[in-house]
Amino acid sequence: MAGFGEPGIDTVDAAGLTVGVVAARWHGELTDHMLERAVAAADACGARSVVARVAGSVELPVVAQALARRYDVVVALGVVVRGATAHFDYVCRSVTDGLTRVALDEGKPVGHGVLTVNTIEQARDRAGLPGSAEDKGWATTVAVLDAALAVRGLARTTQRVGFDA
């Protein structure tokens, strides 16, 4: 069940942080709205956002990497709908692996706001449209800003913990 156990963080105080948002153009009705919601979430949290667009979800990781080199956090948005071939699996895996690699290689939080769904109706229900059950553009942005604040807090911690403390 999507949304079950969701943390329910509506906004965080991310004043001074910068957000690079990259959104795919496939399924533009949905990704355009998700992009609007991501930018609105960044604004509501006090962060400044910059937007880049790419053709499809496969192109998200390389642009996310370029954004991660310039901005505090990255949000990647897209929609991948399962079809009759294995292409869905390859796209979803490469996008997920790529975005994870960017986050780890660059040491920056990267929000995975790519809807990987079986039907376009499932995507609509998660895209933050009027009547949607979920708003992944907003939620992904707030989550990645929250992660950036956690990383920043850890960087300020001088007390050592663990076996070597």
Curated annotation (Swiss-Prot):
GO molecular function, one term: 6,7-dimethyl-8-ribityllumazine synthase activity
Binding site for (2S)-2-hydroxy-3-oxobutyl phosphate: A84, T85, R126
Annotated pathway: Cofactor biosynthesis; riboflavin biosynthesis; riboflavin from 2-hydroxy-3-oxobutyl phosphate and 5-amino-6-(D-ribitylamino)uracil: step 1/2
Gene3D superfamilies registered for this protein in UniProt: Lumazine/riboflavin synthase
Pfam families for this protein: DMRL_synthase
UniProt keyword list: Riboflavin biosynthesis, Transferase
Domain of life assignment: Bacteria
Residues that coordinate or bind 5-amino-6-(D-ribitylamino)uracil: W26, S57, V58, E59, V79, V80, V81, H112
The protein's Enzyme Commission number: 2.5.1.78
Catalytic activity: (2S)-2-hydroxy-3-oxobutyl phosphate + 5-amino-6-(D-ribitylamino)uracil = 6,7-dimethyl-8-(1-D-ribityl)lumazine + phosphate + 2 H2O + H(+)
GO cellular component: cytosol; riboflavin synthase complex
Physiological role: Catalyzes the formation of 6,7-dimethyl-8-ribityllumazine by condensation of 5-amino-6-(D-ribitylamino)uracil with 3,4-dihydroxy-2-butanone 4-phosphate. This is the penultimate step in the biosynthesis of riboflavin.
Homology family: Belongs to the DMRL synthase family.
The name this protein goes by in its record: 6,7-dimethyl-8-ribityllumazine synthase
Organism: Salinispora arenicola (strain CNS-205)
Gene name of this polypeptide: ribH
